[in-house]
Amino acid sequence: MNNKIKVGIFPLTGCEGCCVAILDLPNKLLELNEKIEIVNFRLFEEDEHSPDEKYDIVFVEGSPLTTRDIKQLKLVRKNSKYVISIGSCAHMGGIYHLKMYQDKNKIHDYVYQGEKGIENLDVKPLSAYVKVDFSIPGCPITGEEFYDFVYQLLIGKEPAITQNPVCYECQVRGQKCVLQYGEVCMGPITQGGCD
């Protein structure tokens, strides 16, 4: 009998940088493999599984930029205990969201030069379409964050992402503050946890 947690990793429109980041920790992935069964991960296997299948945990990367993406996202939500957005694209719309600060139709026409049949939906985070249980921010996420997140879920703990700024992490590590040397640093306003 297979008691492993069934996990799916579904990419929407995006660069798949977060999916690649998951592969950064091969030994930890092997360790997780004892407890989870990754049944949908395009970077592991050629055949994609259907979003109609039942999943315990689904990680979604990328932005829902097409009606196909939105349909898949809704199916995944319907068939999953947990839906977790990974990366800035899924969490906030990512780089694609920049088009929302201009005339999106003008940008569309410039990029696609009058090409017909290309959708031009508003860019929204996953949470605009479905309930998202947790988010792992970053562009891309780190493999370590992914591993920690899955591990916390496996032991029944509610996953948490650090809320401390990078400045806090530098102080804990005993590093000197570059601001004291007159150097520019975004540490005070940058969320920590990115190693």
Question: Where are the regions a protein language model picked out?
Answer:
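Iron-sulfur-associated redox domains of electron-transfer enzymes in respiratory
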Residues: M1-G182, M186-P188
